[in-house]
């Protein structure tokens, strides 16, 4: 079944939208986190159609040309840039654990949302002070 969220890459978006968000961010290179960062930038300009195709194969070669370089910590970079974790973004914004049924709306602000947001803010505070 198709699902809410994204395969991360490949994505199909209009060139105008790519240019509006500035494509991939350099602070995530080389390494992890550029795909969720790109999706967050899309979310912030109002894109709400994130659909993963269930009946498709995606082959990812894990940056074969970059294997010998030191990778960034994409999860930490994402947290410090956006104030929330990739996991929180996938769960509450993209709703990646659900079958695709509609264009997404704003996250539901319930106890689960605020508890997760609180954890993100504690992690943000910790990393902004202790990991320079």
Task: Describe each model-derived feature in a short phrase.
Residues 1-20:
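A recurrent flexible, glycine/aromatic-enriched loop bordering the glycosyltransferase active site
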Residues 29, 51-70, 77:
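Active-site donor/metal-binding and catalytic loop motifs
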Residues 31-37:
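Acidic donor-binding loop at a coil-to-helix junction in glycosyltransferase catalytic cores
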Residues 42-43:
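Hydrophobic residues within well-ordered alpha-helices
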Residues 46-48:
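Loop/turn elements at helix/coil->beta-strand transitions in domains of secreted/extracellular proteins
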Residues 70-76, 80, 88-132:
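Non-catalytic, C-terminal membrane-associated alpha-helical segments of glycosyltransferases
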């Amino acid at each position: 079944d198709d699902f809410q969220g994204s395969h991360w890459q490949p994505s199909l978006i209009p060139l105008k939208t790519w240019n509006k968000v500035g494509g991939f961010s350099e602070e995530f290179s080389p390494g992890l986190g550029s795909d969720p960062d790109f999706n967050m930038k899309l979310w912030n300009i109002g894109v709400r159609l994130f659909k993963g195709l269930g009946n498709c194969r995606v082959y990812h070669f894990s940056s074969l040309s970059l294997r010998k370089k030191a990778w960034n910590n994409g999860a930490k970079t994402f947290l410090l840039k956006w104030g929330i974790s990739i996991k929180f973004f996938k769960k509450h914004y993209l709703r990646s654990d659900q079958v695709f049924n509609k264009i997404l709306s704003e996250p539901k602000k319930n106890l689960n949302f605020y508890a997760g947001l609180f954890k993100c803010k504690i992690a943000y505070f910790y990393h902004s002070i202790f990991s320079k």
